[in-house]
Amino acid sequence: QTLKETLFHEKLENGLEVYLLPKVGFEKTYGLFSTNFGSIDTTFVPLGQKEMIKVEDGIAHFLEHKMFDMKDGDAADKFAKLGASSNAFTSSSRTAYLFSTTTNENACVELLLNFVQSLDITDESVEKEKGIICQEIKMYDDDPDWRVYFGAIANLYHKHPVRIDIAGTCDTVNNTYKDMLELCYHTFYHPHNMMLFVVGNIQPEELVDVIKKNQNKKHFLPETSIQRKKIEEPESVAVKEQIDIMQVEMNKLIVSIKVNDIMTNPQEKIKRELSFNLLFDLYFSKSSVLYNEWLSKGYINETFSANFTQERDYAFILIGGDQDDYHLLQKTIFDFIEHIDDLVIEQEDFERIKRKTIGNFINSYNSPESIANSFSRYYFEGICSFELVDYVSKITIADLNEVKKYFNKEYASTYIVKKDK
């Protein structure tokens, strides 16, 4: 209601959740088809089986690469012929396929459904893909920004698969085979584990008919709830400090903090995430006193950032940036962690940051990409992204002070990418 949007929702007989958001006056239409399956889903009970199995790391990303293969060509080429662009991405907890178009909207939705709901792979095509993915992994390995970011996360975890790169390693990629990909596909690409979201220049009643007709032609096994292995992760961090030597112009450092309190209540979870976001905005936005003080003293530069991430069953804080004197940056961050309770939050500053955040959320609803990506990101967490404005408006200073307890040196680790002298 706050956003004055009308969202159409229908759950189809096969279990697929469909959400359609018509935007009057929008030229662009954006479709996103997501599955609740990401890089951390490597130990599970396959559909129709009883025993838990472990598949290779990086398999969700490998499958994403192969989904565009169709019996009669490549899905991306078919979207291009319809005047649309297409893409896909894999995160730790989901895989999403998407298109963007200003024409042939219904045909694009059908193509999206068709290519994601059929897997056309051969042993040869799987083998061929291995080299391509390995090249991608090596490219990321050579990127110092990726190395410090991912290394900071990996340092925190002993057992949780989030410590492993989304694409896996060249070894795990080379040990991935056709039957394993098919097993994951049939388990996680079942309609009941997926969600279709289309936003833009659409006629919802007409489009929902197109979607229903498309789905009625297809046969799926009866749905069963997916059993994933619960990870028993120790509270301690795996590695306290790590230094990598690379060819960089300036040293890079990230302090990561493991958050062991894994929330299951969606409302509590989103409240915590938004409280962290407001807190970091308060301390580290370009207009904040603390940020500008650190900047003027040379503790940090424009690369500095701080953020909080939480997914299905893990959460962490990352604070860092580029700094020649990385010892100084590390000390600055650890002093901040130690004395965060002494930093008083003024009501006036808090209200200003809240208004800014609400304004940003409302502005994001002018972009079909932002709407779809935000909806998909929160959907599998049990949150409707259209309610984010209401959640932010209810947050208090007490909520921000509450998340300060997670800034704990005991659960902190440092990852440094140091220049080769």
Residue ranges, per PLM feature:
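Charge-rich, well-structured scaffold segments of protease-associated domains
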Residues: 70, 74-226, 266-271, 280, ...
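His/Glu-rich zincin catalytic helix
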Residues: 1-74, 185, 189-293, 412-421
